[in-house]
Amino acid sequence: MHFNLRAILGAYLAAAAVASPTPDLAARADAITSLEQLTSVITSFRNNGNPTDEAQARAIYERIVPQSSPSSMQEAVAGVKTITDANPGDIFKSGAEILLGGFAGGTYINIINAYLFTGSSNNINLRQPFPPVYPKADPRDAPYSVSESKLRAAIYIPPGFTYGRKQPLLFLPGTGVRSGPSFASNMGKLFTNSPIADPVYVNIPNDVLGDIQIAAEYVAYAVNYISGISGNRKVSTLSWSAGSVSGQWALKYWYSNRDKVNDKIGISSDYHGTVFAKLLCPGFETPGCTPAIAQQNYNSTFIRTLRNNGGDSTYVPTTNVYSIFDEIVQPQADPNASASLNGATNVELQSVCTPVLPGGAFYNEHAGVLFNSLAYSLAMDALTNPGSASLARVNAEQACAQFAAPGITLPDIFNTYAQLPIAALAIIAYQPKVADEPPIMPYAQKDIPA
């Protein structure tokens, strides 16, 4: 009964994220109700205040009264694309305008409260894996620096999880967000409603803004733990952005994961980092303002260490889907896409759908690939066939003609775009800020390029 209540309440809170703003907020004297007002407030904040002050930044977001939300998917994605194009690298201002324009489906408070359970990193998982997976599931595994209790608490297992009757599918989040909120309204929803996979959400503390090497510990443990409580059935992973990097690091240094992962599916990944990393933290000393962003600079020491000695290639069957219109990760065009790995099925949406068809159009940016029909078709194909996905097995013509994957609704798109303001505020809130990337862990120092 306890878990059913959580599911019901969680669904209610998620629905609340697309509700109208509360009358109290709209009536506040300091409510922000126009773009001109918002621009003035942000300019004043940056010129006269402390642009790194999380409390001031949060107060701005909480004052924003969303205007009438778009009435169609086409209007929603076009509006968000216009905002991100107008504010290149300014994730805070883009997030604010997404809230104001109604593209996130609700107020900032609505959004934060919508996924209290699926976004939790304080879960109670009492089942014990067999055989034990901590401190090592394989003698060759890298050592953990995080306690088993913390690693396990980050795993949110939804009500109805079948413990191996369906293939477990671990969702790995990107920078600045949690897994549940990132996926529950797109790929997570679609696979929950399918007989193919059983979603599990890995909610890494600090929103994947800390050291990615630590994030990889959460991934490595989650893979072994979920397999160990699911009859030792292999699991698969579906990751967004930096989640793909933490997953690849886990596969490289936790040998036990290679035997436990059936498929690795990456959406908008950045295995080579991104030339835009420095733009995500204006006002901070470069190359980064949080450890993870510093690590994701194109050709950072972390990235070069990951890619060296085999990390630029697959360890398990891998499918990567990405878009040239990604506003966060670049380069993202073949043959130099950051999302590409040697030996993987690497699919640039525009090379298949062209930019003319909906499946490859301009609105397929960093978050848009999460509800892209071809991306979902390829993920489904990978999970239902041996090896990685194959374009020859999917109906690419049909998928490219669709605006979003079947089953995705307008509120789902709102909830997906709501991750941008969440990430923006998480970046500002993260402490301590850094001027350089963390040192490479001792177990990986042998792979630092000379």
Summary of predicted features, one role per range:
Residues 3, 15-171, 397-399, 411-450:
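Flexible, membrane-associating and regulatory peripheral segments of lipid-active enzymes
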Residues 148-203:
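Short, surface-exposed "cap/lid" segments of acyl-processing enzymes
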Residues 170-174, 203, 240-241, 268, ...:
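The conserved beta1-alpha1 loop
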Residues 204-221:
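Catalytic nucleophile-loop/oxyanion-hole region of alpha/beta-hydrolase
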Residues 216-312:
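Serine-dependent carboxylesterase/thioesterase catalytic core
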Residues 314, 320-322, 326:
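Short beta-strand/loop motif that positions the catalytic acidic residue
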